[in-house]
């Protein structure tokens, strides 16, 4: 069969061909491999036994991470190296793990989701990132890998022992990352005012947008914060805070999550406080209850509160 094109329609066909080719090129660039390109679901181990299997599960099945650069980084930064007990059972399961000092390392799907949300704000070079409540150092290491050799990452943590352990974990992973990573002992709520940041990651829940204002002030124009927001014993909202090139702030809530609270060192080390997770965890063969209680639903006026805060912070 021979297809004869109407001369009047040739420009249209040519334009459509260019658009189709552009779509395929873009799809190929965004795809990590043939499974993404053709939108084929890859079979994944639901009980991952390695970092690679874990990231495949998050990427192909749970679809918590889509950006290919984030996928590559998550495969490079081995979660097991950052756990308190290197012999912990099921280190690659998608669940939070205790790391001591009443702190936890978040579930892998939360790391994946939050880093994915930051992906398009990571500069090609000379970027600066801030990791608040760096804890195990896992996300700090991921940010160090993502920012590249010209970038800089600041991790703020108020438990010195966790910082020491983070440094040792990164040394085992890739000691050259420490050339661009700096850990500081301090109160993460205040950030670190000596720098302005392209991206800010909060690994614990900040009480309110008002409390987060100091962090928003430290964001560069064109930058982004991803953070859980809410009171310590509530569910939290995962929020994305963007500052455009003119310095105008916009905020979006992406839904309900549950994190440990961003709190003082004294409160965190108080033996009456428990990690803010809601599940039974198997630790060294012994099942341990890590808090289980009825929690109020998030504020139904959330969108109104966000709009009010946007108006306040953008007021000239």
From Swiss-Prot:
What does the record give as EC number? 2.1.1.77
Question: Which reaction is catalysed here?
Answer: [protein]-L-isoaspartate + S-adenosyl-L-methionine = [protein]-L-isoaspartate alpha-methyl ester + S-adenosyl-L-homocysteine
Q: What InterPro entries does the entry give?
A: PCMT, SAM-dependent_MTases_sf
Q: Which GO terms describe its biological process?
A: methylation; protein modification process
Task: Please verify whether the record's keywords include Repeat.
Answer: no
Which Pfam families would you find in this protein's record? Answer: PCMT (PF01135)
Q: Does the keyword S-adenosyl-L-methionine apply?
A: yes
According to its UniProt record, which protein family does this protein belong to?
Belongs to the methyltransferase superfamily. L-isoaspartyl/D-aspartyl protein methyltransferase family.
What job does the chain carry out? Initiates the repair of damaged proteins by catalyzing methyl esterification of L-isoaspartyl and D-aspartyl residues produced by spontaneous isomerization and racemization of L-aspartyl and L-asparaginyl residues in aging peptides and proteins.
Its protein name is Probable protein-L-isoaspartate O-methyltransferase
Its taxonomic placement starts with: Eukaryota, Amoebozoa, Evosea, Eumycetozoa, Dictyostelia
Gene that this sequence comes from: pcmA
